[in-house]
């Protein structure tokens, strides 16, 4: 039979093993709010048995190792959601600025249009009122300024987005370089039979940060962890990183290039960088087109109706706004063509007190 010392040794060994397990639990609790931390578990194994007098006795328990608990599918889902979050937040911030441009009642185009039609309505009640005529010209110039301010504000947003592209690319390159280094450390520790849990946690957190910046794909290969863009452009392979580049080249705008020199700007869809490029390359051009179309169509329609009337001297009406032959840069070139209030063609029959043409001009508000 085993002696007292053997029994005591088994008991001590059991206490040490379970103390180690308690330490793991305490460490898990302490790191509950640590970004990237993965819960660890203690692996307890039966100690080697021993024989005495042809009888086999148990050797107790040993603490084999600590092991991080990872759900790879859940981790990939976190990366996907983080990409979407980065993309959505970037677009929301940019669109909030755009909304301010058009919804501002004091400076927005919509508010300026309403104010302009209000002054036309007031003039229609007394077409010979010089002050009311001057108010129409003043509000018309305010409308022109609102178009110019909208163009300037959209350009400012676009410039800010464009400048952020190389900054985001630099962030991506720093993260991929750090991830590649940690990849090498993980491989080295695994080769030595060590548990790389802490290093893997650090790597997972960096990958999460990276996924907030761009759409990435994470795969485990025989060479270790591999990161690519969603379209397969390599970012990290084992302990080697591949830096992206951002430059304008022959373009006015910043483009993103792979380490091999391929323009991958259009391939980047997710993360902050994807959101930035989507607003810059798709949303803003559409807004410029809509703004220019509005300026061109409004100026053309108003000029056509204005020319159908007569001014205070009984002369045929002329262009009220500067003619805009094309929609290109129409908002930037929008302006008032007349400076003399008496040239406002209020009359429909040439008589001084007629407001017939003004009523037709006011009716354009509903078109």
Question: Model-found features: residue ranges?
Answer:
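S/T-rich, low-complexity, solvent-exposed segments of bacterial secretion/appendage proteins
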Residues: 1-367
């Amino acid at each position: 039979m085993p002696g007292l010392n053997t029994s005591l040794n088994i008991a001590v060994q059991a206490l040490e093993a379970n103390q180690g397990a308690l330490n793991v639990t305490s460490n898990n609790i302490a790191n509950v709010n640590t970004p990237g931390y993965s819960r660890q578990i203690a692996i307890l194994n039966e100690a080697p048995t021993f024989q005495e007098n042809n009888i086999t006795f148990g050797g107790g328990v040993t603490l084999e190792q600590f092991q991080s608990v990872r759900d790879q599918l859940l981790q990939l889902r976190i990366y996907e959601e983080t990409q979407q979050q980065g993309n959505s937040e970037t677009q929301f911030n940019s669109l909030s600025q755009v909304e301010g441009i058009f919804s501002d009642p004091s400076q927005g185009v919509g508010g300026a249009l309403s104010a302009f039609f209000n002054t036309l309505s007031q003039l229609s009640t007394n077409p010979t009122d010089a002050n009311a005529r001057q108010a129409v010209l003043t509000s018309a110039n305010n409308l022109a300024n609102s178009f110019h301010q909208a163009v300037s504000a959209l350009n400012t947003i676009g410039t800010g987005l464009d400048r952020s592209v190389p900054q985001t690319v630099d962030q991506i390159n720093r993260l991929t370089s750090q991830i590649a280094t940690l990849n090498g450390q993980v491989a080295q520790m695994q080769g030595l039979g060590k548990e790389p849990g802490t290093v893997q946690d650090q790597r997972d957190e960096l990958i999460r940060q990276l996924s907030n910046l761009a759409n990435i794909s994470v795969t485990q290969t025989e060479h270790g962890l591999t990161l690519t863009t969603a379209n397969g452009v390599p970012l990290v392979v084992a302990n080697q990183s591949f830096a992206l580049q951002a430059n304008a080249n022959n373009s006015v705008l910043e483009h993103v290039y792979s380490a091999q020199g391929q323009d991958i700007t259009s391939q980047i869809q997710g993360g902050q960088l994807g959101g930035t490029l989507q607003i810059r390359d798709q949303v803003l051009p559409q807004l410029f087109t809509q703004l220019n179309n509005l300026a061109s169509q409004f100026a053309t329609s108003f000029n056509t109706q204005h020319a159908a009337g007569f001014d205070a001297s009984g002369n045929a009406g002329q262009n009220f706004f500067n003619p805009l032959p094309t929609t290109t840069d129409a908002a930037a070139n929008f302006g008032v063509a007349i400076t003399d209030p008496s040239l406002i063609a209020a009359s429909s029959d040439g008589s001084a007190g007629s407001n017939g043409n003004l009523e037709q001009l006011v009716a354009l508000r509903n078109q």
